[in-house]
């Protein structure tokens, strides 16, 4: 809503993401947005510390500099918009349109297979048989965590079998967890380099892959 009120209108946003729009026209819209004096306002409205804490609590900003999320998210989203195929990015579509343009954007949305998932409410310590799993994805939970909690997680994950993988992401957080994981895991740094280039979700600085020794 803030972007519509301060920068652009709904019709123009739809035109930007329409696959029938010419590259020249899309570039014009893109430059119009970037040069708009109100371009900064939506990020101030949405990503200020007060709004973030109100929604996620103060734990969400634990490792970020105070007030840094406004510029951080502006930079990330602007970089995404500047990509040649930005109109095809489902994450940008969801941000600006509120929906995906295609039902085929993610394979799991239209999978014909019967996917039965076991849902466990709680943290990783609520999973009694953690060694059963080959891949553990922690999302960006460590952005919310102090060092002691990270250490507790790593100790628990040490139960994983050799060759198992732990994946985590970092948003506005440059903490290096290597020294904590190093006791039991080997970091695959090429994973981070690859996803910094190819990730479509735009928001993250780091993508860490640790393999159980």
Task: Cite the ranges covered by each PLM segment.
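Adenosine-cofactor binding site in Rossmann-like domains, unifying the SAM/SAH pocket
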Residues: 108-127
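A short glycine-rich, Lys/Arg-flanked "PGG" loop and its adjoining helix->strand segment in the class I
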Residues: 149-164
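Class I S-adenosyl-L-methionine-dependent methyltransferase module
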Residues: 1-111
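A short acidic, Gly/Pro-enriched loop at the edge of an enzyme's catalytic core
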Residues: 125-137
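Conserved beta-strand signature within the Rossmann-like core of class I S-adenosyl-L-methionine
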Residues: 162-175
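Active-site-adjacent loop/helix micro-motif of nuclease/hydrolase catalytic cores
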Residues: 129-130, 145-150
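Hydrophobic adenine-recognition pocket in adenosine-nucleotide-binding enzymes
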Residues: 141
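Core SAM-dependent methyltransferase catalytic element
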Residues: 194-213
């Amino acid at each position: 809503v803030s972007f519509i009120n301060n920068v652009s209108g709904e019709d123009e946003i739809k035109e930007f993401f329409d696959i029938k729009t010419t590259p020249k026209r899309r570039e014009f819209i893109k430059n119009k947005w970037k040069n708009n004096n109100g371009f900064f306002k939506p990020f101030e409205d949405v990503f200020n510390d007060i709004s973030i804490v109100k929604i996620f609590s103060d734990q969400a900003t634990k490792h970020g500099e105070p007030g840094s999320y406004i510029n951080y998210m502006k930079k990330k989203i602007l970089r995404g918009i500047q990509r040649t195929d930005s109109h095809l990015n489902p994450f940008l579509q969801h941000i600006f349109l509120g929906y995906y343009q295609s039902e085929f954007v993610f394979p799991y949305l239209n999978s014909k297979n019967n996917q039965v998932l076991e849902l466990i409410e709680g943290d990783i310590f609520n999973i009694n048989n953690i060694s059963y799993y080959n891949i553990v994805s922690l999302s960006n939970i460590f952005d919310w965590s102090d060092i002691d909690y990270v250490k507790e997680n790593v100790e628990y994950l040490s139960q994983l079998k050799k060759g198992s993988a732990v994946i985590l992401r970092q948003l506005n957080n440059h903490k290096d967890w290597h020294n904590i994981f190093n006791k039991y895991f080997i970091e695959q740094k090429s994973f981070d380099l690859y996803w910094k280039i190819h990730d479509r979700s735009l928001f993250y600085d780091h993508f860490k892959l640790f393999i159980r020794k």
